[in-house]
Amino acid sequence: MFSWSYLMGLVMVATATLSLARPSYNIAEDTTLEPEDANSSGDDEDDNDGSEDFTNDNNHMRAPYWTNTEKLEKKLHAVPAANTVKFRCPAGGNPTPSMRWLKNGKEFKQEHRIGGFKVRSQHFSLIMESVVPSDEGNYTCIMENEYGSINHTYHLDVVERSPHRPILQAGLPANTTTKVGGDAEFVCKVYSDAQPHIQWIRHFELNGSKIGPDGHPYLKVLKAAGVNTTDKEIEVLYVRNVSFEDAGEYTCLAGNSTGISYHTAWLTVLPDEERELDSSSEYTEIAIYCVGGFLITCMIGTIMVCHMKGRGKKSDFSSPPAVHKLSKSLPLRRQVTVSADSSSSMNSNTPLVRITTRLSSNNDTHLLAGVSEYELPEDPKWEYPREKLTLGKPLGEGCFGQVVMAEAVGIDKDRPKDAATVAVKMLKDDATEKDLSDLVSEMEMMKMIGKHKNIINLLGACTQDGPLYVIVEYASKGNLREYLRTRRPPGMEYSFDINRIPEEQMTFKDLVSCTYQLARGMEYLASQKCIHRDLAARNVLVTETNVMKIADFGLARDINNIDYYKKTTNGRLPVKWMAPEALFDRVYTHQSDVWSFGVLMWEIFTLGGSPYPGIPVEELFKLLKEGHRMDKPGNCTNELYTMMTDCWRAVPSQRPTFKQLVEDLDRILTQTTNEEYLDLNNPLEQYSPSYPDTRSSCSSGDDSVFSPDAMPYDPCLPKSQHTNGTIKT
């Protein structure tokens, strides 16, 4: 690792005059390291020196021997997680020796590793892609023929990339000098593994002071990343037509889920010499205009004062605008400082938020005495008049708040007099400061992501003169899981009520359309650099017109301090929807969302079936590591099932992207007719080992994720065991 960093450092020095390069310790995500040669990918390319591996004496028999001992000298190898590793044991002998590998003294088999490995006997090499911490250990190659054997052991250490705050290139932004009327440019280079949020900030004075009462400087946000802003655009700040008022201190501020970094530069403004050389006649003319303008201004001012006195004392609207202050107490979010510390790990592009508390100093608890005691900056684009909102019945509760139905008059700009049904998110009475921070973060995230037909969209917010209300779209048909279950045909095996007539009869095209809509929603979220982390049917809502909308994508979840194997106070983790790399190594990417999308497809084509029913969590871990996957649902075509299994590939890079899924589903949907109703004779099946289900009762805990009472009821479905090694649900 040291030699690699050292080489990169030399390259940077050599090219410093030509371009700006990344620091040597920032290794790209898709870099492939080979223990003995970092210049080769070690994956799909043949070895340049492969001839060494085939040394063979045709004249006499010989026991195995090493053909290149230099490649065996380095025994200890440390590589970053997610890279590809190749171990080589170049050997010769007559007859050509066979090769086998041991890990920690035991035979190394494909099923011992998620994603397996490659063995190239021709080059005597072992290749492992996307290594994770569980791959650490001793790897021994044994070369043998009938005349003897030799062996060599490598030790592999997988180095997890420790999260770090953004790194700003030294010397940038640089101090700049320009003349009045000219243009100034500041450049800021930001390096960060997690997606950074970048802001340009201007320091200014208020009431003659640059520092506020709390000791923090007064700041004004000049430029921030938006939905359609590229990294290159946000890294450059232009100040056009500079005046003396523009002189001062400018800061480039970058924050991610780990922390914040900032560099400051000064803008110096010089007078325009050409303008100073104007003739005296021009100065005289200017002076005349100034005196005349001053006299006119005084007259107008006198008239206005007299008029105001006649109308009586009016309300004072001259209070200074809200300002944003730099806080070191927690990871920066958009326009927000939270007085209490927070260790939450936000999404990589979590927006920056500012909250100013007025709680009295003698309040020792973290509970909010009243949400109205918190001041939130007003966003005119999204602010909705509180008096036009009429709250209705509760719709449900979440981990930090509750949701109620409401009527909002004029929230649709095209129909200002009409009332629309909406859903309103608000805090509970016992909400904490962190709960408020989370709700504001979710609101700001939804602002950043923008609108799409297949996600729950933000409609507005009430942030002033009362508790925080976040207004979102209302989906009248509830979550997708219950929507599908209530539409199971009466004759379908394990329907809730065989005498019940379903509200609507589902066709095969309905299910494909549902899947296609959700793929489009996830494609949009991925394009906005949003990782969902909890994609499942329970987190999809259905509107009155059967439009599928992904929900809870803006929720900032804490993933640093979670026990993946035990029930927590917030319920169960969605282990049955989580990709192996997220489950075992806490690696969350768009490709881990693709895995969850495959499970969501399985839920759809089983009409709300529960994944892996009857399988304990510990057994599920073992099955996933061994490469087992759920069987094809009865109402699913081979092509769609292949799409599911592609989403469940062990190596994340081998899974399809959401863009590819949208294209494939669009094609399938176009070819599907409307008359294909569900075949009631097809049972719903899934993989399960052929052992009896020993649970004494059915629990909603199998599907409840963040709240033990996520469902009002979860009827126990009868199970038919030992039917071709499967369990039906």
UniProtKB/Swiss-Prot annotation:
Residues that hold ATP according to the record: L395, G396, E397, G398, C399, F400, G401, Q402, V403, K425, E473, Y474, A475, N479
Residue ranges of the TM segments: 286-306
Activity regulation, short description: Present in an inactive conformation in the absence of bound ligand. Ligand binding leads to dimerization and activation by autophosphorylation on tyrosine residues.
Topology Cytoplasmic: residue spans: 307-729
Ranges of biased composition (kind: Low complexity): 693-707
EC number: 2.7.10.1
Membrane topology designation: Single-pass type I membrane protein
UniProt keyword list: Apoptosis, ATP-binding, Cell membrane, Cytoplasmic vesicle, Disulfide bond, Glycoprotein, Golgi apparatus, Immunoglobulin domain, Kinase, Membrane, Nucleotide-binding, Phosphoprotein, Receptor, Repeat, Signal, Transferase, Transmembrane, Transmembrane helix, Tyrosine-protein kinase, Ubl conjugation
GO molecular function (one): ATP binding
Active site: D534
Extracellular domain ranges by topology: 22-285
PANTHER family: FIBROBLAST GROWTH FACTOR RECEPTOR 2, TYROSINE-PROTEIN KINASE RECEPTOR
Protein name: Fibroblast growth factor receptor 2
Species this chain originates from: Notophthalmus viridescens
Gene that this polypeptide is encoded by: FGFR2
